[in-house]
From Swiss-Prot:
It comes from Bacillus cereus (strain ZK / E33L). This is Thiamine-phosphate synthase. GO terms for cellular component: cytoplasm. PANTHER family: THIAMINE-PHOSPHATE PYROPHOSPHORYLASE (PTHR20857), THIAMINE-PHOSPHATE SYNTHASE (PTHR20857:SF15). Keywords: Magnesium, Metal-binding, Thiamine biosynthesis, Transferase.
Length: 219
């Protein structure tokens, strides 16, 4: 196995759905299935925060979600937890600046997909030099889903990464909705990542379809 190509990674980032059980008011397995039917291109398991599952329950839930992703041929990424990613033989892992360092993650994960959340050009360059396949840049807009977010960057912050010669695939993170998706792609992102825009939508399927359309129109 070799590392994923930049072109392939860029395509996978188009509509990136992030979810845990506590992000949904409906059955999370059904929400994921609808999102996959609607056209998400990659999925990240993020079981964190108030009411999140732990221990064996968390592992079982992750396996159920992973099995559904496999049915649709969509990569299954684990948020932060490298050990869980290895245990599940996940397609990759996404880490933040406060999580395990990228060099150690790359050693453990081999050629699997590694994404890194970055907020500055320095963080971005460090992540790229040490083996990141893509960057999560944000928060682009204010968000209530994640309580531990940094200052809002806006689309200008995202555009600044491209202006500074950062060419690695980038996914925009934070407060992204159907209405503002186009502006994120136009600022230089390869795709958008969302939690509540799909997980809390009246129809996860319809919401995903609209996000896919917005990204396609803007690329």
């Amino acid at each position: 196995m070799s590392r994923i190509s930049k072109a392939e990674m860029s395509k996978l980032l188009s509509v990136y759905f992030i979810m845990g059980s506590n992000n949904c008011t409906k059955d999370p397995l059904q929400v994921l299935r609808e999102a996959l039917e609607g056209g998400i291109t990659i999925f990240q398991f993020r079981e964190k925060g108030e009411g999140a599952l732990t221990g064996e329950e968390r592992i079982c839930f992750a396996k159920e979600l992973q099995a559904i992703c496999k049915e649709y041929g969509v990569p299954f990424i684990v948020n932060d937890d490298v050990e869980l990613a290895l245990e599940l033989d996940a397609d990759g892992v996404h880490v933040g600046q406060d999580d395990e360092g990228i060099t150690s993650v790359r050693e453990k994960m081999g050629d699997k997909i590694i994404g890194v959340s970055t907020h500055t050009i320095e963080e971005a360059r460090w992540a790229i030099e040490n083996g990141a396949d893509y960057l999560g840049v944000g928060p682009i807009f204010p968000t209530s889903t994640k309580k531990d977010t940094k200052a809002v960057q806006g689309t200008k912050g995202l555009a600044h990464f491209r202006e500074q010669g950062i060419t690695i695939p980038i996914v925009g993170i934070g407060g992204i909705s159907i209405e503002n998706t186009a502006s994120v792609i136009e600022a230089g992102a390869d795709g958008i990542s969302v939690i509540s825009a799909i997980s809390l939508a009246e129809s996860a399927y319809e919401s995903t379809k609209k996000l896919v359309e917005e990204v396609s129109k803007s690329l």
